[in-house]
Amino acid sequence: MTHPIFMVGARGCGKTTVGHQLAQALGYDFVDTDLFMQQTTNMTVADVVAQEGWHGFRQRESLALQQVTSNRCIIATGGGMVLAEANRRFMHDKGTVIYLHADAELLAQRLEENPQDNQRPTLTGRPIAEEMADVLAAREALYRGVAHHVIDASQAPEAIVASVLKALRLSAA
């Protein structure tokens, strides 16, 4: 298997952490679409949203997805990457999509424990636990619909990587 592996899920589910470890385990490259965008625009996600709005950000996000996709690469996508049907189709057709599933309470806890200065701005302006519940309610079907494999992301990163590797081996058999 050499095609790209796309990591999808809400903020805080572990896409970047797990993606790095998975890339090491497989000998693949690793790219985070948000970090790629920040490096190519010299702006944080919050800056892009402030200057161009969410629509402009989503357009940049879709372009970044296409630019970074290559064989033997793990791609950690932004939590909203699945909102565009074209992105879902692209990821599903070009590689294997892994959905790292975690409940809203765990996501909020992780985001509160590890706040980032350049973290995406709030979508709703409400407390993070409420926002994550709303985000999952709106996106859960999209994450599951695009995914080739759904992985429980409530475990430690090493256990999640082991679960992903097992799922990939089973699908390759």
From Swiss-Prot:
Q: Which top-level enzyme class is recorded in the Swiss-Prot or TrEMBL entry?
A: transferase
Q: Which GO terms describe its biological process?
A: amino acid biosynthetic process; aromatic amino acid family biosynthetic process; chorismate biosynthetic process
Q: Which GO terms describe its cellular component?
A: cytosol
What domain of life is recorded for the organism? Bacteria
**Notes concerning its domains:** The LID domain closes over the active site upon ATP binding.
The UniProt entry, under NCBIfam families, shows: PRK03731.1
This chain belongs to the protein called Shikimate kinase 2
This protein's gene is called aroL
